[in-house]
Regions:
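Long alpha-helical repeat scaffolds
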Residues: 344, 348, 352-647
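Boundary/linker elements of alpha-helical solenoid repeat scaffolds
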Residues: 57-72, 101-113, 142-154, 191-210, ...
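Alpha-solenoid helical repeat scaffolds
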Residues: 52-127, 131-159, 331-354, 358, ...
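Hydrophobic residues within the alpha-helices of tandem HEAT/HEAT-like
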Residues: 89, 100-111, 129-130, 141-152, ...
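Fungal eukaryote-biased detector of long internal structured cores
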Residues: 124, 131, 135-136, 141-278, ...
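Acidic, serine/threonine- and proline-enriched intrinsically disordered linkers and terminal tails
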Residues: 15-75, 231-241, 245-417, 421
Length: 647
């Protein structure tokens, strides 16, 4: 070892320190570091420096000015004027647009006379929102227009009706099915408000050669597009097949709303009374039929001539009908017949899909499918009723009751599919009534006895006191079909009708039943009658005739009662006149095949006495309701008393 180093022969000298290790010098901590600036760069700001610069921009806030005096303006609860709300209807936010519509509705409901003063602004501001993309805005618009159209009279709304119909039709043709469906709510309002304008020239939608462009045509074409069916005009232009094909997938609720609106549209186009259509084939003389249908109708003043287009007939078709009318018994197809040809495939397929859920054997019923089936059958009934009656009228004009209905196989196909579902009684009473009338239409058109298992069904209905007036009138064609057809139980139905009359307490139903039975009693007086009325002969006619003075007394006292509304008083007074007229006709006849004429006249006299005066045991003679009748009714009663024994 030499001086702290060891010498080894192989590794050489190995150095190591024999003293302690030397400490490294530590630098003091620095609070801030100074960044070295680069050449040509400015001084950088500190990391904790506060930016005190600002930028200003001018904005316009005319609707939120605190300096604006609105103490004398009509405002909403949010202090918004009509001008503010009109501007907000164009706002990009759906919520603001909806609030604007509801704000205008608030102004209309709050301030009397505001609608009449600002009618144009209130309507025109909301019209563009009929086809809005937001569902809540469309719902608010429908509610808004429902209030406006209810409060506006027809004269005030007339200038805005065409624009509203155009925009409603545009919304019904929107690319979104949701917008189309919601537009039907507004269409329903317009059909109630301006029915004639909304359905104007609707038949042109079925004619490919028509150059018309009216609201009714556009609306019906919109319905065709929504249902996915092709109209005659479209098929002729595009060369499509005659079978309708559905190209639009619709849910149950959507199809229900479309068919409900379509039914309302078609019912508006058909405002004629069709309760007596079933008697058209019972008369060989058109004059007798016209007189029979006019029985018990209220007197009408002379109607003014109106200019209207001839529906569904071009000049060429009229010429062909005039040339070949004398040799052909087949009337030209009406607009309703062509329409039922177009809608039949789509309606039938939808109906067959819905009926199993309605007429389920286990008793479970889908309310949505039940309503859907009801609206489909109502559309069918309306179209087939107009189709059959138009052919019967054409046959009566030619002096024959045998007419050819080209589209009748479609009705036969419909009844074939419906028969299994209506073979037994069910809770769907209104569907059974429609089915019965469809069967009556087919039977009258074909003049062939159709198997109708409705006699027990009708007897059950007539034994129930809950029969409504509308249901009773809908059953009139079925009643006539049964009593005029040689089938088992037809005499029982006639007896049930006469017995059912004595149990009626509803005044409207009592009036409808009287007019129907009185018409049946007048049938033997027509020479051109060609219907089988053997079932009408029953001893119960005597009882029914002698019960009419009681009906006359009830109606007469109600007509002058202070509890009756003006409409109820008018209806009761009309029933009084109808009963007096019928009894006078009966008294004028030398004999009647239905009852003992002499016996009835002798029994009527004492039963009519209370109408003139009543002997009270304490107060003595009291004047009857006769003294409060109009002069014309008093003269009618006097004429009746001269034909029977003096009261």
């Amino acid at each position: 070892m030499y001086g702290g180093a060891y010498l080894t022969p192989s590794l050489g000298p190995l150095f190591f320190s024999t003293m302690g290790t030397k400490r490294k010098a530590t630098k003091p901590a620095v609070d801030f570091t100074k960044t070295k600036q680069k050449l040509g760069k400015g001084k950088q700001a500190a990391s904790n420096a506060t930016d005190t610069s600002f930028r200003a921009k001018a904005i316009a806030m005319p609707q939120q000015s605190i300096l604006l005096d609105r103490s004398h303006q009509v405002t909403t609860r949010r202090r918004q004027t009509l001008s503010d709300l009109v501007q907000h209807t164009h706002h990009p936010s759906p919520g603001v647009r909806k609030d604007a519509v509801m704000g205008m509705l608030e102004l209309v409901k709050t301030y009397a006379g505001f609608l009449e003063l600002h009618c144009a602004a209130l309507i025109n501001a909301a019209l563009p929102l009929l086809g809005d993309d937001d569902v809540h805005v469309r719902g608010a618009v429908a509610t808004y227009f429902g209030v406006l159209l209810d409060r506006l009279d027809d004269e005030a709304f007339a200038p805005f009706a065409p624009s509203m119909l155009l925009l409603t039709t545009s919304a019904m043709s929107h690319i979104s099915m949701a917008v189309r469906i919601d537009a039907l709510r507004v269409l329903s309002l317009l059909l109630d408000k301006v029915p004639a304008l909304a359905t104007e020239d609707w038949e042109s939608a079925l004619d490919a050669h028509s150059g018309s462009d009216r609201h009714g045509q556009r609306l019906l074409q919109a319905f065709f597009a929504m249902l996915g069916v092709a109209a005659d005009a479209h098929r002729q232009r595009l060369g499509l097949s005659t079978a309708s094909t559905a190209s639009v997938e619709l849910g149950t609720s959507q199809r229900l709303r479309i068919l409900r609106a379509l039914g309302q549209f078609l019912s508006v186009t058909d405002q004629e009374e069709h309760g007596m259509w079933c008697f058209q084939s019972a008369f060989a003389s058109p004059s007798d039929l016209e007189h029979f249908e006019g029985l018990f109708q209220p007197s009408k003043a002379c109607a003014l001539w109106t200019v209207a287009a001839m529906p569904s007939a071009s000049s060429y078709e009229i010429h062909e009908a005039l040339v070949h009318g004398a040799t052909s018994q087949e009337a030209p197809a009406s607009a309703h017949e062509r329409l039922v040809r177009i809608l039949h495939p789509s309606l039938l397929s939808t109906l067959l899909d819905a009926l199993p859920s309605v007429m389920s054997p286990d008793g479970h019923r889908s309310d949505a499918h039940a309503e859907l089936a009801q609206h489909i059958l109502q559309v069918y009934l309306l179209l087939w009723r107009r189709t059959i009656t138009s052919h019967l009228a054409a046959g009566a004009a030619q002096g024959t009751t045998r007419v050819a209905v080209p589209s009748l196989p479609q009705l036969s196909q419909l009844l074939t599919h419906l028969a299994p579902y209506f073979a037994e009684k069910s809770e769907m009473l209104h569907l059974h009534v429609i089915y019965c009338e469809l069967v009556a239409l087919y039977t009258v058109a074909t003049q062939k006895a159709h198997h109708l298992s409705s006699v027990p069904f009708l007897l059950d209905l007539l034994s129930e006191p809950s029969l409504s007036p509308a249901l009773y009138e809908a059953l009139l064609p079925t009643f006539w079909l049964v009593v005029s057809s040689p089938m088992d139980g037809h005499t029982d139905v006639m007896a049930a009708l006469l017995t059912h009359f004595d149990t009626l307490r509803d005044r409207t139903l009592q009036a409808a039943a009287f007019r129907f039975l009185a018409r049946l009693a007048m049938l033997p007086t027509y020479k051109s009658l060609q219907a089988n009325i053997d079932a009408l002969y029953t001893p119960l006619w005597n009882t029914w005739i002698l019960s009419l003075p009681r009906v006359l007394w009830q109606a007469a006292t109600w007509a002058v009662s202070s509890k009756a509304s003006p409409a109820e008083a008018r209806d009761a007074q009309r029933l009084v006149e109808d009963v007096l007229t019928f009894l006078r006709w009966i008294a004028l006849m030398p004999r009647h095949p239905f009852f003992d004429h002499a016996h009835v006249l002798n029994e009527l006299a004492p039963r009519l006495t209370p109408l003139f005066h009543v002997e009270h045991p304490q107060r003595g003679p009291i004047p009857g309701p006769y003294h409060k009748w109009p002069v014309a009714t008093q003269h009618l009663a006097q004429a009746l008393t001269k034909l029977v024994s003096s009261p």
